[in-house]
Amino acid sequence: MNRRIISAAAVGLALSVTNTPVAAADKVEEKGDVGQYVDLQPVGLPVVSNGRLVNYVFVYVRVNLTSAANVSRLREKEPFFRDALVRAGHRMPFNSPSDLGKIDAPRLIATLSRDAAIITGPGQIRSVVVISQTPRRRLVAPPA
């Protein structure tokens, strides 16, 4: 009888130690900024060669936010990010001159970073990442 009580107490003590708030807080600290980003809906950007529209490239973009940013408020601004990207892509296409199936990612990142900082305010944007690019058609660059 005493053995049962002692073993039940030992099991209860072991379970209570693993479910403490301190252990849960350690797990949260390991993850860091979980969910501190805004994923943009896919955007079709034009590819222009010799003044003619030859293709579209669908781009998936993620805007990474700082830990001080209000994520829910900035996720509501996702249409503004897409609008800025589409306007910039039509003003001066981001296509790579060597490959008509790719976008010049560094130029897109620089442009969207600048526009996103204007949309959100200073100190809210950590980085912009192009997750993937999918061309509508596979094309080869025209001979020079």
Regions found by a protein language model. Name each.
Residues 1-144:
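Flexible, low-complexity charged segments
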